[in-house]
């Protein structure tokens, strides 16, 4: 089994905090999620998280005008220069302070960051290699409080900065003679956003109390004059012109510009002047909501403003005409962005973790996604590996598509936290348990709750399991220590299993038999035979409280995680322990900021809380109260690999040792909330609360893994963590993993065999090299008529390799029919031999089924749409023929008009209709 799993995608979290950005083509939204960045492709309906992470939560993202580079800045002031083309980090930089916003100039040559009460302009990194990608050009002083927002003119000559001191500052990007800085007032609250007009120095400023000021400049952008150098600077410029090798030194030299709110009279003569044209108020009706975010589209003069109540307004400037107003959320709108065409508007709500894209002309949603409000607790893969269902403490059950990364259905029937989720064997029914005392079954065809199972006395369910046939549903109680068994078809309670003396922590059915394993805090695991009248079969005694239990896919082994950080393996037939793993040293727990003891002593109370066997049963995945997920080899009982699921220092218990410089006689300085002034007052957290709402918007959640599952295909695994739903998958592009390689197998020999039309030998050598492009070249060189001959001569060992390659190729290749022919011939000619090894081949077959099913779903929609259109065309033609027979005296113009109408109804009205659609 391969262990080269890498981070693939982040689901369950669509927006945390920070600014949203549209890509230059306007089809994708870049959203910060924790310490990562996710790109939502709205055109292709797909989300993808970049394989990089910052040290703290992302605070702001700046996108270059060409869309190739992005600057990602976290809460600690660390910046990453990221290439969005190759999805890799190019440069690290530390701004030595908290950065509020970052913005590239429209020409892409410079960018400005607002840090503290200053603004700094840097030379943007170019296309050539540089030792220092960020070179400081100028530092602008002037505001007395924190700077909040930036906007550039279209020609990149000037930029405007808003501040919390209620002032707006216009700075020149160059040393202009008539504009170095200009301070504007007129507001009574902090500036939220400021924007320049298109091809003008006129600007708009918006404050937090809902006031818009329009400022007119008496000078056009072309009227700005460069200040001639004098004194030693003129001599320096002359020397640099003579010496070509020192040409770039002036650009590396930092310049400081200090602005004054009330400059002297002699400084105003011959300078640019601003005057206020108008002042508008958003809160006219007495609904005094704070303005929290704004965006302005310069070409269409469209202003979008978001408020703390979840309402947004669309205005047309400069007349300030209200286009429409809408409430999209119950929480404050944290960020607003408009795409390049001005059609789509993106909203981010940090309170609920919502991301919405609104098309204002048609008044419809392009994207509407929301993660779990509280932490996710449980997850389960569908049998084909295409869907993932998650349950959270917020009582919601969400179903995610692993291919697109989007949630397509949310069930809200539970009134309390969800504790367990599972799929039935068919993959169309989801069964969940909750603390509200119900177990519910949801239908994924009609998206409804069709069964609700309850107990005779109200109880809180902590776990749920469904047998292989999907007929028996069982759930464990947390307070009555009982296990309830229901029938899926009738919904009736079949039996109540008693015997445990502590809360039930886990349930699992044997995949091959109707045997139920239950783990409890009473230090036992009990095996129950569902077809036996006495029910109980065996009792396995443990050395500590049981926290998780799982069966191997073939049902021949049972794994149990206990409170003393051990994983024990049992033979369920003979009730004999076959092995154990000591995992305390592999957890590597951290020290929380409120802990009075060291991480070494705190590790005695930490353990694995989630277990899952791999698809082949040779290894087991374990995670729990730690930032690490471990893969153990079951037979050898050794650690194979350990994955660090997060490096986000904004979470608690990430580091083993606390920072001694923050430890004082009054306590830890890290516990003081630095951002408390940004919200309305300070919310005090409830004492003793470990998860949930915490009563405070400012808290550091503890890093932990609540659930783990391997995909049935065996190529990826998922984990529900404090960060969200993380998916790790095998990346074969960067891994050279040959199979039975010797010195005679080279790419040259493969191509030589192809030239000699020895296709079987070429395919075998390509499979031994295990290079995907070489295998693709060898398979696609086989003529269609010789596929059956080549497949019949392949050894059985290599048939599995070809099937695995075909399953992965279905996701990216356009040769659908060709690869389907290969799959059909392989399964028909080698089906009987493959059936004898069904257990080991099951992940490959499920991976193949998942890939083919996706193509079937896509093509069936298109074919159904064409089929219905053809039926409609036939019905219209029959109706027109009947009309002609009844009214033969109709004119030719009427007949042509009726034909045109029918064609327009079908969406094929010729060139004129296409021009109308384009217009």
Swiss-Prot record:
Q: Where is this region: Disordered?
A: 238-267, 882-919
* Chloroplast recorded as keyword: no
**UniProt-listed Pfam families:** Utp12, WD40
Traced from the root, the source organism's taxonomic lineage reads: Eukaryota, Metazoa, Chordata, Craniata, Vertebrata
Please state the protein's primary subcellular location: nucleus
Protein name from the UniProt record: Periodic tryptophan protein 2 homolog
- Protein species of origin: Homo sapiens (Human)
Phosphoserine-modified residues are 898, 902
> What's the gene?
PWP2
Compartment list: Nucleus, Nucleolus
Q: Name one GO molecular function term.
A: RNA binding
């Amino acid at each position: 089994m391969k262990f080269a799993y890498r981070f693939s995608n982040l689901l369950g979290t669509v927006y945390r905090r920070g600014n949203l950005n549209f890509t230059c083509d306007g089809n994708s939204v870049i959203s910060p999620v924790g310490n990562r960045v996710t790109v939502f492709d709205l055109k292709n309906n797909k989300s993808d998280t970049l394989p990089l992470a910052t040290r703290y939560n992302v605070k702001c993202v700046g996108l270059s005008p060409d869309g190739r580079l992005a600057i990602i800045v976290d809460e600690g002031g660390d910046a990453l220069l990221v290439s969005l083309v190759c999805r890799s980090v190019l440069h690290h930089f530390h701004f030595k302070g908290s950065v509020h916003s970052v913005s590239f100039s429209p020409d892409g040559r410079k960018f400005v960051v607002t840090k503290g009460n200053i603004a700094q302009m840097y030379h943007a990194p170019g296309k050539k290699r540089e030792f220092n990608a960020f070179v400081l050009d100028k530092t602008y002083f002037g505001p007395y409080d924190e700077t909040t927002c930036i906007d550039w003119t279209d020609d990149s000559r000037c930029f405007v900065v808003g501040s919390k001191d209620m002032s707006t500052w216009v700075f020149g990007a160059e040393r202009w003679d008539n504009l170095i800085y200009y301070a504007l007032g007129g507001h009574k609250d902090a500036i939220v956003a400021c924007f320049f007009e298109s091809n003008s120095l006129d600007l708009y400023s918006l404050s937090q109390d809902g006031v818009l000021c329009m400022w007119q400049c008496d000078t056009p952008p072309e009227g700005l004059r460069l200040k001639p150098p004098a004194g030693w600077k003129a001599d320096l410029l002359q020397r640099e012109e003579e010496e070509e090798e020192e040409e770039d030194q002036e650009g590396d030299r930092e310049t400081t510009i200090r602005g004054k709110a009330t400059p002297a009279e002699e400084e105003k003569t011959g300078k640019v002047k601003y005057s206020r044209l108008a002042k508008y108020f958003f809160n006219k009706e007495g609904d005094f909501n704070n303005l929290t975010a704004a965006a302005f589209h310069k070409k269409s003069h469209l202003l979008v403003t978001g408020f703390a109540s979840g309402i947004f307004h669309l205005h047309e400037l400069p007349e300030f005409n209200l286009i429409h107003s809408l409430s999209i959320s119950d929480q404050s709108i944290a960020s607003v962005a408009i795409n390049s065409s001005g059609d789509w508007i993106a909203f981010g709500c940090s309170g609920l973790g919502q991301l919405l894209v609104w098309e204002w002309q048609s008044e419809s949603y392009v994207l509407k996604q929301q993660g779990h409000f509280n932490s996710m607790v449980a997850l389960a893969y569908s049998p084909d590996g295409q869907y993932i269902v998650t349950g959270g403490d917020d009582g919601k059950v969400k179903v995610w598509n692993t291919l697109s990364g989007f949630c397509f259905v949310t069930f809200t029937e539970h009134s309390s936290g969800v504790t367990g989720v599972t799929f039935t064997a068919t993959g169309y029914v989801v069964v969940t348990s909750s603390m509200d005392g119900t177990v519910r079954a949801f239908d994924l065809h009609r998206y409804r709750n069709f069964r609700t199972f309850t107990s005779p006395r109200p109880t809180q369910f902590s776990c749920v399991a469904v047998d292989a046939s999907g007929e028996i549903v069982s759930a464990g109680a947390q307070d009555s220590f009982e296990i309830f068994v229901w029938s899926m078809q009738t919904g009736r309670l079949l039996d109540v299993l008693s015997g445990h003396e502590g809360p039930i922590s886990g349930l699992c059915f044997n995949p091959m038999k109707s045997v139920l394993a239950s783990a409890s805090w009473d230090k036992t695991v009990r095996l129950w035979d569902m077809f036996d009248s006495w029910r109980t079969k065996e009792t396995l005694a443990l050395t500590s409280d049981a926290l998780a239990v799982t069966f191997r896919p073939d049902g021949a082994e049972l794994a149990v995680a206990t409170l003393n950080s051990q994983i024990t393996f049992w033979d369920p037939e003979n009730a004999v322990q076959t092995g154990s793993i000591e995992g305390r040293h592999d957890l590597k727990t951290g020290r929380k900021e409120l802990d009075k003891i060291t991480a070494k002593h705190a590790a005695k109370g930490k353990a694995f809380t989630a277990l899952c066997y791999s698809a082949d049963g040779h290894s087991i995945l374990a995670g729990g109260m730690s930032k690490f997920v471990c893969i153990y080899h079951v037979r050898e009982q050794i650690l194979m690999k350990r994955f660090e699921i997060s490096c986000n220092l904004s979470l608690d218990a990430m580091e083993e040792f606390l920072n001694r410089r923050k430890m004082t006689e009054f306590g830890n300085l890290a516990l003081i909330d630095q951002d408390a002034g940004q919200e309305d007052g300070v919310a005090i957290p409830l004492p003793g609360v470990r998860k949930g709402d915490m009563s405070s918007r400012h808290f550091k959640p503890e890093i932990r893994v609540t659930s783990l599952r391997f995909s049935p295909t065996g190529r990826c695994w998922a984990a529900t963590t404090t960060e969200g739903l993380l998916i790790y998958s095998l990346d074969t592009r960067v891994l050279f993993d040959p199979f039975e390689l010797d010195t005679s197998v080279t790419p040259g020999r493969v191509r030589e065999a192809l030239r000699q039309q020895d296709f079987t030998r070429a395919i075998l050598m390509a499979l031994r090299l295990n290079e995907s492009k070489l295998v693709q070249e060898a398979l696609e060189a086989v003529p269609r008529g010789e596929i059956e001959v080549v497949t019949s001569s392949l050894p059985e060992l290599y048939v599995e390799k070809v099937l695995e390659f075909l399953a992965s190729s279905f996701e990216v290749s356009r040769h659908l029919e060709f690869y389907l022919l290969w799959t059909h011939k392989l399964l028909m000619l080698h089906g009987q031999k493959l059936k004898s090894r069904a257990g080991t081949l099951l992940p490959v077959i499920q991976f193949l089924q998942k890939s083919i099913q996706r193509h079937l779903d896509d093509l069936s929609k298109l074919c159904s749409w064409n089929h219905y259109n053809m039926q409609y065309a036939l019905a219209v033609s029959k109706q027109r023929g009947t009309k002609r027979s009844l009214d033969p005296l109709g004119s030719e113009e009427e007949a042509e008009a009726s034909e045109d109408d029918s064609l327009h109804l079908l969406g094929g009205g010729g060139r004129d209709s296409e021009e109308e659609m384009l217009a």
